[in-house]
Design a protein with these regions (language model features):
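Generic hydrophobic-segment detector
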Residues: 11, 23, 35, 39, ...
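STAS-typified acidic loop motif
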Residues: 8-19
Length: 143
């Protein structure tokens, strides 16, 4: 698929980098002139994806999170968040609302939020090999 512009970031799975990641994506997406609602949805989806990497992919040690964004034709923002952490054993169960392996302080709504805020959402994972979240958002053309 052809793209008009792209960025790739790599950063350690520190909680302080979650805000950096969502802000970087919001700044990158701004070239598409999104509405405030679209920008908020994108920031939230990226926040959930990166937080999952920080909390679940690397529970015992720091690891690397890779974030790739591309501008595709027809005003589509393509986002990939990837880790090489512990992976997900049962993707179907993990995608169910309210399911979490993170304890009582976790809501278990991350994948549900990502799926509802983005136009498309795909999840690929294998135990011991990491997880890739691939999301796209088709943005309105503002007049």
């Amino acid at each position: 698929m052809k793209f008009n512009n792209y960025m790739i970031l790599e950063f350690p799975s520190k909680s302080c980098n979650e805000a950096f990641a969502r802000s970087a994506v919001a700044c990158f997406a701004s070239q598409l002139d999104p509405t405030l609602e679209e920008l908020g949805d994108i920031r939230t989806a990226v926040s959930e994806a990166v937080t999952n990497c920080i909390v679940h992919a690397y529970p015992e040690e720091l690891g690397i999170i890779t974030l790739r964004c591309r501008i595709l034709k027809d005003n589509v923002l393509d986002i990939v968040v990837k880790d090489k952490g512990v992976g997900i054993e049962d993707i179907e169960t993990a995608r169910k609302p309210m399911f979490t392996t993170g304890g009582a302080d976790r809501s278990g709504m991350g994948f549900t939020i990502m799926e509802s805020f983005m136009t498309t959402f795909h999840l690929i994972s294998a135990p011991g090999k990491g997880t890739t979240v691939h999301m796209r958002r088709k943005l309105q053309r503002r007049k």
